[in-house]
Amino acid sequence: MNNIYKKSTLQAWNLSAQAAAVNDVLKFNNSQKTGCAVEFANGTGSVTIRKPGLYQIAFNGIAVESGTAGDVAVQLQKNGADVPGAIAQATSANATAVVNPAFETIIEVPQSCACVNNTAVLTVKNIGVAANFANANLSVVKLC
């Protein structure tokens, strides 16, 4: 079968609960991908994009804070820097309050050359209170 028109995609998820302290990167234990623009290793939290283009990034999950009431928040980072607008925040009133953080954004990965490597490494970072995340899901789709 000719896959010339097949999009590069990644669907990464973690169904089981994972404890995430403040500033921890969320990890995804399972994945399914197509194409060759996106690289990911199960059990990690880093997605590497090696081909230039526009990419749609979406995250969702279920979270419960783990002891201290406050804001449960996650932030998409590209090469260690926050991606503006790619943040989800919800207030958890107590240790049993369930929140559903989610965000969606589009990023651009510029063309690389011999002297400039524009590879993008994406992570989802817990920037709120320590929390337990379950059913975390990250999708990356190369639009063009």
Where is each model-derived feature located?
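Extracellular jelly-roll beta-sandwich "head" domains, especially the C-terminal globular C1q domain
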Residues: 1-144
